A protein has these predicted regions:
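Short, polar/charged, low-complexity connector loops/linkers at domain or secondary-structure junctions
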Residues: 41-50, 55, 64, 70-71, ...
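Hydrophobic residues on conserved beta-strands that form the core of alpha/beta folds
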Residues: 57-59, 75, 93, 261, ...
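Extracellular beta-strand elements of beta-rich domains used
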Residues: 234, 264, 279-283
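Short carbohydrate-recognition loop motifs
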Residues: 134-168
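Noncatalytic modules at the cell exterior or secretory-pathway interfaces
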Residues: 256-265
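Short, small-residue-rich packing micro-motifs
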Residues: 1-64, 69-84
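Extracellular ligand-binding interfaces
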Residues: 154-248, 260, 270-277, 288
Length: 289
């Protein structure tokens, strides 16, 4: 939060640097953030630089996602000016519109897509998030592979962790319904408990909390088949507040029902590499029977 009350919230594995010496200047090297910017001084808009664009903000609510190949800007309120670094072309993006800026692409603003309740990962292309993306080969589909991760506040724990971004950037926003179910398919070296969490936001893009689907009921061990494959299911009604945000819970949502799904993460806690990789995550707006 800046001194004037403007708020920028990063998500996932994002890299953001900033300065505020007379004018706010941010550089999003990769990842995504949401922002609620109060009106800025005349002639001194907030400047945001991504690998491919420069964005000028006077006062608005918006979201940005930056990858090497393109930048996505969703505007909720106000007006945002985007300039493409490659050719210098610029566009003003009004409220309730978005632009996906890529080399040689059209900068015409498009209406923000309507929210959906069903979602399925698209791992045939690089997903972003945390982990190593593996393209499809003859023996298996494309996958996001977990990487070693040691929590800062618990250095004795060694997890195998991956995350996948979901909502409100290059695709339509995804809203969670009370009886929704997540189904995860992937591979493991050995049978293990597969833990699952989500991050959610309000409809204005503001961070709303983090929840875990494996704490209320102990997640059973995911047994592997002949090809080391596993499937795990998580009911939204079983999700509880993630311990890492429990101290801030008074200011966050108590349940994920009706909120926007921003990203998800999946991990094992076996003390060693589990070989965890995920081929597919599916959100179904109703219980799996």
């Amino acid at each position: 939060q800046f001194q004037d009350g403007s708020i920028v919230t990063i998500s996932g594995t994002s890299m953001l640097t900033f300065a505020d010496v007379g004018q706010k200047k941010l550089r999003l090297k990769q990842g995504a953030f949401t922002a609620d910017v109060v009106p800025q001084p005349v002639g001194k808009p907030m400047i945001i630089q991504t690998p491919s664009t420069v964005i000028e903000v006077v006062g608005t609510r918006f979201e940005v996602e930056a990858l090497q190949a393109f930048t996505t800007v969703n505007v909720r309120e106000g007006n945002v000016r985007l300039k493409h670094l490659v050719d210098g072309n610029a566009v003003d993006i009004p409220a309730d519109y978005r632009v996906i800026a890529e080399a040689g692409g059209d900068l015409s603003p498009m209406p923000l897509p309507a929210a959906e309740n069903y979602w399925k990962s698209q791992l045939d292309v690089q997903a972003g998030g945390f982990g190593k993306w593996l393209p499809a080969i003859k023996k298996r589909p494309a996958a996001q592979k977990a990487l070693p991760f040691i929590p800062v506040n618990n250095p004795n724990v060694n997890l195998s962790l991956l995350s996948i971004p979901v909502s409100g950037r290059s695709g339509p926003p995804v809203v969670l319904t009370p009886h929704a179910t997540f189904r995860v398919r992937g591979r493991l070296h050995d049978s293990a408990q597969v833990h699952f969490g989500i991050a959610v936001s309000y409809d204005n893009g503001e961070f709303a909390g983090m929840f875990r689907g494996d704490l209320l009921k102990k997640q059973p061990v995911s047994e592997i088949a002949e090809e080391k494959e596993f499937e795990a299911v998580y009911q939204l009604s079983d999700f509880t507040v993630d311990p890492c945000v429990r101290e801030k819970q008074d200011s966050l949502a108590r349940t994920p029902d009706g909120l926007y799904l921003d990203r998800l993460w999946i991990f094992t806690d076996t003390g060693r590499s589990s070989g965890l990789m995920v081929h597919e995550v599916e959100l179904i707006p109703g219980e799996i029977r």
